[in-house]
Swiss-Prot record:
InterPro entries: ATPase_NBD, Gcp-like_dom, KAE1/TsaD, Peptidase_M22_CS, TsaD. Belongs to the KAE1 / TsaD family. Fe cation binds at H119, H123, D310. Its cofactor is Fe(2+). Its EC number is 2.3.1.234. It comes from Enterococcus faecalis (strain ATCC 700802 / V583). Pfam families: TsaD. Required for the formation of a threonylcarbamoyl group on adenosine at position 37 (t(6)A37) in tRNAs that read codons beginning with adenine. Is involved in the transfer of the threonylcarbamoyl moiety of threonylcarbamoyl-AMP (TC-AMP) to the N6 group of A37, together with TsaE and TsaB. TsaD likely plays a direct catalytic role in this reaction. This is tRNA N6-adenosine threonylcarbamoyltransferase. GO terms for cellular component: cytoplasm. It is found in: Cytoplasm. It catalyses: L-threonylcarbamoyladenylate + adenosine(37) in tRNA = N(6)-L-threonylcarbamoyladenosine(37) in tRNA + AMP + H(+). Substrate binds at L141, V142, S143, G144, G145, D174, G187, D191, N280. Signal peptide: none annotated.
Length: 348
């Protein structure tokens, strides 16, 4: 049974897992008609990170406006839609509930099916807007909350072959940025500084030679903090550019080395980089070089910058796959802030 019985295959998608309220209208799973993103970064900057209560309040204020703007920009009426997609996890529980409530209300009001989408699957399927996915593939998922290597044999099949044992890569960037006195979020600033500095400090590359695909960034974070604090105690001024370059060199080398190694062991046609840290130019450049040198037969897919961060377009792309597999939800669908990949295919 298919829900796509109307003239056009159109879905409304809602994303509210963290600090971006986003609503999109997607056609055919790979065409963005609108992708409205209401960012809250300025509200969280003074706290140096996302405050869940503040995030939830912003979602309440923005979600209805975003729905109206998404439909208007797409020139689509509710009657033309075939379903409503919504992120149900992972994320901040309060933030997720706002998006879920809005999506349920809209779906109920217009008698449309509700499609549950795993936020992390959404990041992977953002690559559908670049090119069709070819299986098997490997996805390096790097964000503020996750660092994972995910192997996919087919649509909707996710096998985590490696993950961080402590801090996520994006989390390490933000903590290092705080030490350097950079505004939140710090990833873009550190990336820019790194391109002007050199790897002077040779920070540790954790687990680089271990026979697995797991990551660890807590040791790097500690080494960085100790280097800065020790210099301060000696009254020594360190180069912010060199510190940023040294930190980024460590993160990127570990991510690239482990990813290439995983792609050499698992048969893959494509490598995807997804998540907020996929916007990092240093990582993009290093991965492109490594792929061309070591795995020329593998195609590298990286979403455009505007689709690396949280957005509803990626949720819509993933929702088309869920709909094809008849994965729909009732109005009892609840937020699952800690949901993993392994449960996505079990959604009924």
């Amino acid at each position: 049974m298919t829900i796509f019985t109307k003239e056009r295959k159109l879905l409304l998608a809602v994303e509210s897992s963290c600090d971006e309220t986003s609503v999109a209208v997607i056609e055919d799973g790979d065409k963005i008609l609108s992708n409205i993103v209401a960012s809250q970064i300025k509200s969280h900057q003074r706290f140096g990170g996302v405050v869940p209560e503040v995030a939830s309040r912003h979602h309440v204020e923005q979600v209805t406006i975003c729905i109206e703007e998404a439909l208007t920009e797409a020139k689509v009426t509710p009657e033309e839609l075939s379903g409503v997609a919504v992120t149900y996890g992972p994320g901040l529980v309060g933030a997720l509930l706002i998006g879920l409530s809005a999506a349920k209300a809209f779906a109920w009001a217009h008698q449309l099916p509700l499609i549950p989408v795993n936020h992390m699957a959404g990041h992977i399927y953002a690559a559908r807007f670049v090119a069709p996915l070819e299986f098997p593939l490997m996805a390096l998922l790097v964000s503020g909350g996750h660092t994972e290597l995910v192997y996919m044999k087919e649509d909707g099949s996710f096998e985590i072959v490696g993950e961080t044992r402590d801090d996520a890569a994006g989390e390490a960037y933000d903590k290092v940025g705080r030490v350097l006195g950079l505004p939140y979020p710090s990833g873009k600033e550190i990336d820019a500084l790194a391109h002007e500095g050199t790897d002077t400090y040779q920070f540790p590359r954790a687990m680089l030679k271990e026979d697995n695909y797991d990551f660890s960034f807590s040791g790097l974070k500690s080494a960085f903090i100790n280097t800065v604090h020790n210099a301060e105690q000696r009254g020594e001024a360190l180069s912010t550019k060199d510190l940023a370059a040294s930190f980024q060199a460590s993160v990127v080398e570990v991510l690239v080395t482990k990813t290439i190694r995983a792609c050499q062991e698992y048969p893959v046609k494509q490598l995807l980089i997804a998540g907020g840290v996929a916007a990092n130019q240093g990582l993009r450049e290093a991965m492109r070089h490594a792929i061309s040198e070591q795995l020329p037969a593998v195609t590298l897919l990286i979403p455009p910058l505007k689709l690396c961060g949280d957005n509803a377009a990626m949720i819509g792309a993933a929702a088309f796959i869920e709909a094809e597999k008849n994965h729909f939800a009732s109005y009892n669908l609840n937020a699952e802030p800690g949901v993993s990949f392994m449960t996505i295919s079990e959604e009924g």
